[in-house]
Amino acid sequence: MNKYKSPLTWSLSLGVLLLLAVAAYNIDHQVSAEALNDKATPPTRPDFSLQDLEGEVRHINEWDGQYIVLNFWATWCPPCRKEIPEFIALQKKYDPAGLQFIGVAIDDTEAVSQFAMEMGINYPNLIAESEGIELAKLYGNTYGALPFSVIINREGKIIGRQVGLLSKEKILRLTQLQDD
């Protein structure tokens, strides 16, 4: 009997290992998504107040009656920076329909202010610094990952959460706003 395996046997073995690795990756990510959508997250948004870039204390209930996209982000987070131009465009387009983006920056005022000016951010940004991670956990981000977004309906109920980049399609689907 040949103690060396044929190239076909090696290829099949490698293929099976790759399939197992892909399956394990998908199961892990599916569990992560399910963990974020468990019953531990309150259906109604938690209340909070934070200072904006001008130092004014803003309360989340100021935006009651609107669809809210609450986005936890930081200037040092590349995926956070990537999604902001889309948020700027959506805020401009859907503001008349009652869609309100609110940034919750896990950063200091100076860095956020400079970045907001450079990018032309047209929606409120609240400064949470490191305390923002705990606030994000109250909204269901058990991993402390950024970016993290929460979509809240007009009645103040959490209707969606997203760890990582939030797509325009998901926002429009959950808010039932129409894309022209």
Task: Set out the residue ranges of the language-model regions.
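Conserved hydrophobic/aromatic "anchor" residues
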Residues: F48, F72-W73, F115, Y123
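N-terminal targeting signals for export/organelle localization
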Residues: M1-D47, D180
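A short beta-strand-turn-helix
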Residues: D47-I68, Y94
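Structural microenvironment flanking redox-active thiols in thiol-disulfide oxidoreductases
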Residues: R81-G120, S130-K137
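Thiol/disulfide oxidoreductase modules built on the thioredoxin-like
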Residues: M117-N122, A128-Q176
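Short pre-active-site segment immediately N-terminal to redox-active cysteine/selenocysteine motifs
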Residues: Q66-I68, F72-W76, D108, A145
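Conserved redox-active cysteine motifs that mediate thiol-disulfide chemistry
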Residues: D64, F72-A89
